[in-house]
Amino acid sequence: MAEDIKSKVIQAKKASIELSSVSTEVKNLALEAMAQALDKERKAILDANAKDLEAAAELKKKGKLTQALVDRLKVSDSKIDGMIAGIRDVIKLKDPVGDTLSTLELDKDLILYQVSCPIGLIGVIFESRPDVVPQVMSLCLKSGNATIFKGGSEARESNRTIFQILVKAIESTDGMPAGAFQLMETREEIMDLLSLDAYVDLLIPRGSNEFVKFIQENTKISVLGHTSGICHIYVDEYVDLDTAWKVCFDAKVQYPAVCNAIETLLINRKIADTFLPKMAEMYLSAGVELRCDEDSYALLEKRGLSPLSRATEEDWSLEYNDLILSIKLVDTIKEAIDHINTFGSHHTDGIITEDASRRKAFTALVDSSSVMVNASTRFADGYRYGKGAEVGISTNKIHSRGPVGMEGLLIYKYILLGKGQVVADYAGENAKPYTHRKLDLKFEDVN
């Protein structure tokens, strides 16, 4: 392991202790400095991104980079506006550090507080998306977490430029510790980072299925993330057709390269003849490749719609991240739910229905981190969920699930305030009893 890698991590770990106690006022000043710096340095960011895009175009020609990754790589003025708005949204969020989550009296003058605190040092490993840097850095800063960033080599110039702009703004703010945010740039550094479980408290990988699986399988550090976004919409027989056409179109076409776009459309057989032909026309006019099961293929072929492809069994398990959609007809809502729970990735799935009992069954039985009713799966996003931004989407069955904002970057500690009590007084034949009484007290109010 290169010593400079370990020294960066150790420096960030030390800075994480200081960062955990920085005041809300100072953190917000640093965040505003970040926003202003991005606005001021637009040209530098766009110039750096242009270099990455030029190199990416060559890699795409050689088949080494997909169009989906190229799309995620591109930075524009409007994307910079989004970065700035995202940071300022985080400023508006309540500082979650030091919140009293519960208070319990164990006995008179022996009070136990459960208080929120930062995780510590977080490693964020991501592919192709330079906007991850300001998005995650702002959330980690506000929640008091030091962060190591490792972006994909295809975004090296963009990541480096944005990172340097932001860190300069942060470290020029009085009261902010130096070294809390670090950047790694080579592929070899990933393996070094994965081995530093003595210092790094959490890893958040953002990228392809294979990429996230690789991270999970090669580290002892806890990993927050999802391996893929195989999302579905089920169109029920009790449906408002205009709603179904609009929502299903948006869920695939609005931005197909992201993990909350649908990959499979399930349609109740009783509504297929009425719903599917127009839906297919809309998709085909938008350039979507349709991979149909036997029944949907026969229905659309009979209507003279083309081009069509036949779905294979493999298609039900594929995340396309592109203008490709699998279509399957089902007999019942149970069949749809079983298909989703078998082939889905527990990310985001939806139902279009006007029937309350179908809605309740679907939301109860679909095992996904977000379940949509008569709304696009594309809403599964930290910003849209009012979190300011997100560090990632988790399909893990832990405390943080779905789009993870600042609340997923916090843990808690127990603080016990006493007046000389000892356990011996609460043991043995004449043991004092515990009161175990819940109190409405805040640790921050204690003198």
Curated annotation (Swiss-Prot):
Coiled coil: none annotated. GO terms for cellular component: cytoplasm. GO terms for molecular function: glutamate-5-semialdehyde dehydrogenase activity; NADP binding. Pathway: Amino-acid biosynthesis; L-proline biosynthesis; L-glutamate 5-semialdehyde from L-glutamate: step 2/2. CDD domains: ALDH_F18-19_ProA-GPR (cd07079). One of its GO terms (biological process) is L-proline biosynthetic process. Its main location: cytoplasm. It catalyses: L-glutamate 5-semialdehyde + phosphate + NADP(+) = L-glutamyl 5-phosphate + NADPH + H(+). It is an enzyme of class 1 (oxidoreductase). Keywords: Amino-acid biosynthesis, Cytoplasm, NADP, Oxidoreductase, Proline biosynthesis. InterPro entries: Ald_DH/histidinol_DH, Ald_DH_C, Ald_DH_N, Aldehyde_DH_dom, G-glutamylP_reductase_CS, Glu-5-SA_DH, GPR_dom. Its EC number is 1.2.1.41. It is found in: Cytoplasm. Signal peptide: none annotated. It holds the Pfam family Aldedh. SUPFAM superfamilies: ALDH-like. Catalyzes the NADPH-dependent reduction of L-glutamate 5-phosphate into L-glutamate 5-semialdehyde and phosphate. The product spontaneously undergoes cyclization to form 1-pyrroline-5-carboxylate. Belongs to the gamma-glutamyl phosphate reductase family. This is Gamma-glutamyl phosphate reductase. The gene is proA.
